[in-house]
Regions:
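HTH-adjacent hinge/linker in prokaryotic transcriptional regulators
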Residues: 3-7, 17, 21, 34-35, ...
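A short alpha-helical element within helix-turn-helix/winged-helix DNA-binding domains
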Residues: 25-36
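Residues in the helix-turn-helix
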Residues: 42
Length: 78
């Protein structure tokens, strides 16, 4: 499995479990690089995948924020 998918799955699981609650800012790319021992490009690819699936939203200059699970469920069921 590609490294970015491993990061994606771990972060998605944290969001679903509430470890990373709605409106919380994700750790910085640098922090995630150190935590997962991955390159910046790999971390960005994982974050892009999270955004594509509706787990997070990027706010330029502010960071990446977790979306509410209700919004995610509505996106896929509504």
């Amino acid at each position: 499995m590609p490294k970015y998918l491993t990061i994606y799955h771990q972060l998605a699981q944290r969001i679903q479990e509430g470890t990373l609650p709605a409106d919380m800012k994700l750790p910085s790319e640098t922090e995630l690089m150190h935590e997962f021992e991955a390159s910046r490009g790999t971390v960005r690819k994982a974050i892009d995948a999270l955004q594509e699936k509706g787990f997070v939203r990027k706010h330029q200059g502010k960071g990446v924020f977790v979306l509410s699970q209700e919004a995610i469920e509505f996106q896929f069921n509504g």
